[in-house]
Amino acid sequence: MTAKNVFISIDMEGIAGVSHGQQVARGSDDYPACRTLMANEANAAVEGAFAAGAERVLVNDSHGDMRNLRPHEIDERAELLIGGPKVPQGMMQGCDGAFDVAMFLGYHASAGTEAAIMDHTYSGAAIYDLRINGESYGEGDLNAALAGSYGVPVGLVAGDDKFCGQMDKRLPGVRTIQVKEALGRWNSISIHPNRACKLIREAAADVVAECATEPFRPEPPYVVEMDVINAAMADMCQLAGHTTRTGARSLRYETDDIRDVVRQKTLWTTLAATALR
């Protein structure tokens, strides 16, 4: 069955041709070019989706301050969700049961992944590790679970080889587009951006025509543990309701609702940021 409504969350670190933090940082000389590379990959997915019969495509700018995509560079058929903070779903803001499939573009591996481009989990400045029921979760994992809570499968992901490998394990049948091989945190061997867009366009069309994955719904209850970078951050995070501090840098929260997991993670991260002085 053709997916009529498509949700796209696009980050920046996993875009083809991107290897260094300077490229994704507002104010750097490299940033404007990276914005265009990001827009091109978003447009490739939009074009593929509409070519295969989609009727609505929503693109959520999911990097940093979430003001990276320039509206005039985006396919006019798409809707663009830009700006932040996006409360309560962040990178998945706008995703709900009205969508038939989700796509994650420009994504990166979870914090602590060896030889992965700019590995981190939501906030590299605050989060050392995020675990659910004892298993480390990256952005792709938790965002897929949030989509799954609405019955939305993730059909396509794109990024470096480490991220794609993590998603292959998490989401059986997902279409992965590896746009680069990470050699370290700041260097990679990338395919040409035009080739990346071609692969994304073709894959998006295939996924809209027929999605091979099921919604990701991890079994509740959820024991959520987050290790922050330092004890001062944990001092602030423990002010959040229903939080148990389990160590100098460690926090714990329990719930039966994956959407509460996302809200608590966001609250902890926001509180941790107040200790960045």
Task: Tell me what each language-model feature is.
Residues D75-C95:
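A glycine-rich helix N-cap at a beta->alpha junction
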